[in-house]
Every structure is written in structure tokens, then in C-alpha cells.
Amino acid sequence: MNKDNHHIKVSLTNNPYEIVIGKNSLESIGDELFNIGFREGLKVLVVSNKEVSDHYGDCIIKSLIKSKFKPKLLIIKAGEDQKNQSSIDLIHNAAYEARLERGSLMIALGGGVIGDMTGFAAATWLRGVNVVQIPTTLLAMVDASIGGKTGINHSKGKNLIGAFHQPRLVLIDPKTLISLPSREFKAGMAEIIKYGVISDLELFDLLERQENIADLSNIKEKLLLEIIKRSAKSKAEIVIKDEKESGVRAFLNYGHTFGHVIENLCGYGKWLHGEAVAMGMVAVGQLAVQRGLWNEDNAKRQKRLIEKAGLPSNWPKLDIESVLSSLQGDKKVKNGKVSFVMPLKIGDVKLFNNISNKEIRECLQKIS
């Protein structure tokens, strides 16, 4: 175990685990698995996509073999349009071929899509096998890999099919961001800004003080580690309080309700998830201004930081009635009313369940 790695405990009652963050931590995956109780002869299915596997697949496999585990590597296509039952069938077929047992392990090596699909495949194979998340995108590092949400999309909406299935370990190696396309890095910054708005004013202020947060090459290693650690810790603290999203975990949906509509109506792939969330945060910021929940200055601060990160901030051209219809398909609708997480100030949000179509229509007309 690398003594330089940073450990964050996700202290759940039934399924506690750690988030391990550190440079070159990929090389110690075998040791990390041994440290949490896995032993010689363990059957492991590593699921990745070609781009990520070309960079890091060999490193993972060598570490697993060194620890006397029995790994198999499955390469599948990533991308939001691949997050479907057909991809799950591919993973399940590979699990069958690898003779995975209930004590076996799946490892998700990739971004949020790979993590979501592998997690869901693990949750549903043999009614649940172990899963480890090794996120290689910024968005997955600070959000998707932590908390046990897994799932796939349905033709009617994003993530409508899924399960809660906590990982045994989340291993984050910031060096994997070097191979990340610039647009993907910026998309991850949207989730980091989200944490600043919902719970961490100091993080928001830290990001505001930087000259450039849109380009990885301009962010010092120490700062990058600090941003990742603060964001992962924010996510972990919320998950510990509310594992199954019955209370404060809903705060993590800030910007996502509108964001999912953008992804759904524009077609998956048109906008990256983080880009859609960024536009969603600006939209719900305007909704909060309308309600008098926070002031125009805070809304402008949020929008400026989103733009500073190189993210889109203007609402796309969408038919308002189509937006209202799409919102009704959201998982968080209760009694026909759409729920929105809205900011009270930077660092504090609240869930509102009584948002009318009239308010939403007025908001969209204002920002369109």
C-alpha cells in the first residue's frame, strides 16, 4: 500500500469502503484488493473501453496477476448511447465465460458510463457480485464512482433502470487525466462546481481564485489533488448520511433535473453529461432568483465560474412544452410535481417539491 495515497472512509452501516486517491495508485490495485480481504485465486473481470484499456489495461492486469488473482479483460464500447441492456448482456456473457462466482469481482476501469454499466452488471449477476470502481475521468472520480448508484438508460429517459450497489473500493489515480480529452475534463469541472454550490463555499472560492480551471495543463498537481479530494469527500459525506437517496442525497441532483432533460431531448451524445449539468445549474439558478431564494449576484457568480471552466452556460434551443413533458418522466416526480434542488446561497441548497409548470415556463422563457 502506497503511504502517499489519501484515504477517505465511506462509513456505511452495511457496506463500508474506502476511496483511495494517489498518483500511480493504479500500480497498487492488487495490493489494495489484498488489503481489503481478497485472496489468491480470485476471479476478476475487468471491464473497460478500448481507449482507456490501451493506456492502463496492462498496468491493471499485471498488478492483479502479481497478487495471484485471475483476471480477464473485457473491452466494450463506451458513450452514453451504449448505456443499454445490450451492453449489460455483453458483460454478463463475459462473466459467465469467466465463471464468476458470488465472491468474485468486477472492476470498472473507465469513465462514468463504464462505471454505471459495470456496477449494474455486478448488481444483477448472481444477484450481486463484488465491484471495484477505478474511474479515469474527472467526472467519474468526483461523482459517478462514489455512492453505489448504477444503471442504464431507457428510451424514455436517462438512468431509469438501475440499482444501488456499493463498491468494495474506489481507486483514483489522477495521472489517468493526462489522457483525457479536454472537453471531458471540462465536463468533470461541472460536478466540482456543483459541490461548491451545494455544500462547500471554500471549494467554490478556491476555484474562483484560479486564473484557469478549464485546462488541465494549467492546474498544478497539488491543486488538482486538493480539488479531487474535497469533491470526493463532499460526495462521501452526503452518501454516508443518506445511502438510498431518501433525504439529503437528493442535493447531489442539483442541476441534473434540467440537465437530464437536455440530454434526453437533444439526444445522448450531443452534450456531455457535465455540460448538460452546467446548463442545468444556470437554469435552476434562475429559478431560484425568481423565487427570491438567492440573489442575482450569486446567480451571476455561478454562471461566471461555469464559463471560466469552459462549460456552456446558455440554455439550448428546446421547445418549452417538450421540456415540461420530459420533466414529468423524471425519477424524482411526486404526484405530478417536479422536484428541484435550489440554492439558498453558495454552499447551501434545499429541495423544493412544489414547482409549477408556470414557474418553469417563466424561467425557460427568461433564459432562452
Curated annotation (Swiss-Prot):
Zn(2+) binds at E191, H256, H273. This is 3-dehydroquinate synthase. SUPFAM superfamilies: Dehydroquinate synthase-like. Belongs to the sugar phosphate cyclases superfamily. Dehydroquinate synthase family. Its cofactor is Co(2+); Zn(2+); NAD(+). It catalyses: 7-phospho-2-dehydro-3-deoxy-D-arabino-heptonate = 3-dehydroquinate + phosphate. NCBIfam families: aroB (TIGR01357). Binds 1 divalent metal cation per subunit. Can use either Co(2+) or Zn(2+). GO terms for biological process: amino acid biosynthetic process; aromatic amino acid family biosynthetic process; chorismate biosynthetic process. Disulfide bonds: none annotated. One of its GO terms (molecular function) is metal ion binding. PANTHER family: 3-DEHYDROQUINATE SYNTHASE, 3-DEHYDROQUINATE SYNTHASE, CHLOROPLASTIC. It is found in: Cytoplasm. Catalyzes the conversion of 3-deoxy-D-arabino-heptulosonate 7-phosphate (DAHP) to dehydroquinate (DHQ). Its main location: cytoplasm. Pfam families: DHQ_synthase (PF01761), DHQS_C (PF24621). The keyword Repeat does not apply. Pathway: Metabolic intermediate biosynthesis; chorismate biosynthesis; chorismate from D-erythrose 4-phosphate and phosphoenolpyruvate: step 2/7. GO terms for cellular component: cytoplasm. The lineage of its organism: Bacteria, Bacillati, Cyanobacteriota, Cyanophyceae, Synechococcales. Keywords: Amino-acid biosynthesis, Aromatic amino acid biosynthesis, Cobalt, Cytoplasm, Lyase, Metal-binding, NAD, Nucleotide-binding, Zinc. It comes from the Bacteria. NAD(+) binds at G112, V113, I114, G115, D116, T136, T137, K149, K158.
